[in-house]
Amino acid sequence: MARLLVLACSATKRPDHDRIPALARYDGPLWRTLRAADPDGRCAKVAFLSAHYGFRDAATPIADYDARLTQDLAERMIASGVTTRWPRPPSPRRPDTYGIHAGAEIAGLTRYGAKPFQEIALVGGRLYVDVMHALVRGFVEMGCVRREARVSVINWPIGRMRQDLRAWLAAAPARGDQP
């Protein structure tokens, strides 16, 4: 069964000066739980949602940054859907050729819809989960997530989120059971 974990970014980051994969860059409690519970990345494909980078594959190398998801930014991300590039250009006068849009990223994760996700976990605070839900609706329309996909939301106090994330990862089918 094709599974996708979408995890909110983390304020705690490794301070490496070079770009490193988001999976290594983010160092908050949920990211540490992910690395401990699924060190080989076999339980699910992992993506992240960032106030700066938008929706990306967790293997994407990213630079260190400091940005918070505000209500205003969350509303703009929801309104812009899966076709707006993140990060946004540094100036409105610059061409919109910065970053990548969520639709392109999910297409790559699903082999352009050939292997749509059947199970998804959305993990993060309320604003992040709101944006994630909007993106998933767009991914369904693109054919990259099945309409009947099971969507789990993990949004509690941090200790409970860590337990639920670990349990969701542990519930993955055995490697041989996946198509």
Task: Give the location of each predicted region.
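Peripheral peptide segments
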Residues: 1-179
